[in-house]
Amino acid sequence: MEMKLPGQEGFEASSAPRNIPSGELDSNPDPGTGPSPDGPSDTESKELGVPKDPLLFIQLNELLGWPQALEWRETGSSSASLLLDMGEMPSITLSTHLHHRWVLFEEKLEVAAGRWSAPHVPTLALPSLQKLRSLLAEGLVLLDCPAQSLLELVEQVTRVESLSPELRGQLQALLLQRPQHYNQTTGTRPCWGSTHPRKASDNEEAPLREQCQNPLRQKLPPGAEAGTVLAGELGFLAQPLGAFVRLRNPVVLGSLTEVSLPSRFFCLLLGPCMLGKGYHEMGRAAAVLLSDPQFQWSVRRASNLHDLLAALDAFLEEVTVLPPGRWDPTARIPPPKCLPSQHKRLPSQQREIRGPAVPRLTSAEDRHRHGPHAHSPELQRTGRLFGGLIQDVRRKVPWYPSDFLDALHLQCFSAVLYIYLATVTNAITFGGLLGDATDGAQGVLESFLGTAVAGAAFCLMAGQPLTILSSTGPVLVFERLLFSFSRDYSLDYLPFRLWVGIWVATFCLVLVATEASVLVRYFTRFTEEGFCALISLIFIYDAVGKMLNLTHTYPIQKPGSSAYGCLCQYPGPGGNESQWIRTRPKDRDDIVSMDLGLINASLLPPPECTRQGGHPRGPGCHTVPDIAFFSLLLFLTSFFFAMALKCVKTSRFFPSVVRKGLSDFSSVLAILLGCGLDAFLGLATPKLMVPREFKPTLPGRGWLVSPFGANPWWWSVAAALPALLLSILIFMDQQITAVILNRMEYRLQKGAGFHLDLFCVAVLMLLTSALGLPWYVSATVISLAHMDSLRRESRACAPGERPNFLGIREQRLTGLVVFILTGASIFLAPVLKFIPMPVLYGIFLYMGVAALSSIQFTNRVKLLLMPAKHQPDLLLLRHVPLTRVHLFTAIQLACLGLLWIIKSTPAAIIFPLMLLGLVGVRKALERVFSPQELLWLDELMPEEERSIPEKGLEPEHSFSGSDSEDSELMYQPKAPEINISVN
């Protein structure tokens, strides 16, 4: 029997709600453009043009000791931004009480331990859902209820024909009883009377201080709403009483909820005593229903009882039933690492609920929509000269003021610290290598100055200011080859290099004018991973190589080694210093003659020898045998400490704020730890060397390079040939890095600037060539580290929920400050000289390992060493045979090995062509692998994307709901796959 209030029809909605302030309603009648009930991310909601529905918090309360000591206890629940309170009212005979709450996942109050349990996935009994449906079908349904207080709301839901005035008064007094929350003191605190309610005062309507200061409030996002579910057994009720209310405007219902939030929903489930936990389980079922995003989306738009029941039926169709005896219902299922997508549930909901539909996308289309450059407006040809450059400028100018204002955040400070140290280390490392490769024509000072000038200019004018310019391994290889060529043909190196730079700038400008950057659409994951793996291996190789070189500078002293002998000579009548000099080195360790005044220094250390008036003699007197081992200790300490601190963010230790701080400043803390350890022991480890004088490394040359010098004029024309190869290298290096940084899964809002970036690099090539400074291009690893240090994640995270990736903090200031500090480092030598070089080498190793471990290529290499039964459940292994996966990985390994061999041999002059050849190899793979396999192993090229329907991929992967695994994982929102530890 449906119970209605007198005059209920006056406020029961006949259409979708109109007064929801969060704007959930769809004003567009077009069913193809409506909001999605999924709402897994704010970004998707913005793409659809509607706000996201609020999160749902659910709280379960229990009444103890009725009627002598009326007291409510919370048992609770919450889901993303709707707060629900569920009060459970047992009868006189019920003395036990349960405490639960849901903040996206269920938490149970451990009464004995006095704490909340770990969040877990709630499980329900199927009969409780069926009984709940029956009770709601026969109960009271009020939509757009105008109640403005708890008293008005209680009067509305209890004004039913089946209740006598006396029972109605008792029930109202019970519902108006102030609940006893977990964080409050015990004792009965009645709200508004005992048997008959009275008008509430302003103080009684105001939320309590405990509600406003509840720590749980910080875990709920702004705009969160509350819903209340009251369920329980009352002996004085003769028949069940059910009511579901949706308030027209959200209202704060006094101290009813644990957290002070405006309430939107109210559900009442009462009835006479029954065996078991019938109403308790029905209350849990109602709370779980309201925490479900699909049900919540439907009930917000429901216009009558039929819509409400249809939403519940849709939920029942999605329920998974576990057979009895095969699963313990009391077992707690831990939260998944990544929440499943709701897209696969759309078809069933669209069949049941009248409302805006969501257009269906095939998984293939969606995969490319989230690809690195699919449908990117920056990569569309305009057909005009410099058309792409003009479009990039027009696109970036409106964002220019915000590029500086968005940097006013503490996170940017930590990013500056780490990227500055990484940039300085890179400048010193590559400056030293460049000095060795060019016999001092360029050195550390030129590296510092060039990094500061080129990097700062690029950050101010580039289309993607998050890019960090630096010397790179491939460009260094080309510089070495160019210097060797100049020396072999007796050419003046810097003037010849100037003409090469002029030609490179010219070729790059031609590429900009002809919009050649649109060719990056052919740079698929195969090319990106090959290049990224090569750069990461260069970082690892250089870090380990530099560390091993320290063992030559500071050799390890082995016991009994004759090369490190040390004797103490005492002046005396028989002492003959000339005899020591004439003694062969191999025989000096055997000389322990008092006639010569010599004593083995192992018995008398050199400082003691000097104090007693002797003279230490021998090559081992001034050798500190611990430097090599201690440098290795600093190297490994900085590496492992940075890795450990980065992993703290996802660990169980410390509060979330502390974990995030340690993770953000992991590299800086690792460097400080290494410096402190070095200062504590006081060993003479090699320190960071910063130039102290502002003058060119090569004596006798000025800051401007003469165009000709001693070279014949025709060499200025011949320089075009090596410049062509270098242009290919610059284009590939710059654009591959740009493609990686501008992938759509990074959720960049300000757009890319492929043409503008290449134009800036061309101008800087001309400037650095004229000043005799190193050439600079986008540094893949450091740029990725820069972006990773600026990751934005949601602050409000429910217990058990991982922070949602929101995007990157896009701005220009961090890079600009980094390069200004790099230039000023020449004047910071008194401070920087205390940083040990092994510590910086450890950070270099850390960056290379983190970048290498974050790409899919590395995971596929691991599969080569795993038996099939121990392999992880990767999505690609469900759709591609394992032998085909191994074949694809083997081809990538062969290409990577070939690139490394060519880079390390005199044939490195063709290294740029080999990078370009990666695109050709990927194109040839279309003859070896099917489009279906390439779709999962790599990405399809533009021609393959257009032919997807023709090749039959769409029917196989179409989103039909039957293949739940594909549908869920294909639409799974993911953060960028880079895990480079930065600050």
Curated annotation (Swiss-Prot):
Sugar attachment sites: N183, N576, N600, N979
Naturally occurring in which organism (per UniProt): Homo sapiens (Human)
Cellular component terms (Gene Ontology): apical part of cell; basolateral plasma membrane; plasma membrane
Substrates-to-products reaction catalysed: 2 hydrogencarbonate(out) + chloride(in) + Na(+)(out) = 2 hydrogencarbonate(in) + chloride(out) + Na(+)(in); K(+)(in) + 2 hydrogencarbonate(in) + chloride(out) = K(+)(out) + 2 hydrogencarbonate(out) + chloride(in); Li(+)(in) + 2 hydrogencarbonate(in) + chloride(out) = Li(+)(out) + 2 hydrogencarbonate(out) + chloride(in); Rb(+)(in) + 2 hydrogencarbonate(in) + chloride(out) = Rb(+)(out) + 2 hydrogencarbonate(out) + chloride(in)
Descriptive protein name: Anion exchange protein 4
Primary localization: membrane
Keyword S-adenosyl-L-methionine: no
Protein purpose: Electroneutral Cl(-)/HCO3(-) antiporter that favors chloride ion entry and efflux of hydrogencarbonate and sodium ion across the basolateral membrane and may participate in salivary secretion. Also mediates Cl(-)/HCO3(-) exchange activity in the presence of K(+) as well as Cs(+), Li(+), and Rb(+). Does not contribute to Cl(-)/HCO3(-) exchanger in the apical membrane of the upper villous epithelium.
Compositional bias segments (type: Basic and acidic residues): 946-957
Membrane topology of the entry: Multi-pass membrane protein
Keywords annotated in UniProt: Anion exchange, Antiport, Cell membrane, Glycoprotein, Ion transport, Membrane, Transmembrane, Transmembrane helix, Transport
Gene giving rise to this polypeptide: SLC4A9
Region (Disordered): 1-48, 186-205, 332-357, 946-983
Family to which this protein belongs: Belongs to the anion exchanger (TC 2.A.31) family.
Keyword Ribonucleoprotein: no
SUPFAM superfamilies reported for this sequence: Phoshotransferase/anion transport protein
Transmembrane stretches, start-end: 415-435, 443-463, 500-520, 530-550, 624-644, 665-685, 712-732, 758-778, 815-835, 837-857, 899-919
Tissues where the protein occurs: Kidney specific.
Recorded GO MF terms: chloride:bicarbonate antiporter activity; sodium,bicarbonate:chloride antiporter activity; sodium:bicarbonate symporter activity
Subcellular location: Basolateral cell membrane
Region Membrane (anion exchange): start-end pairs: 415-983
GO biological process, one term: transmembrane transport
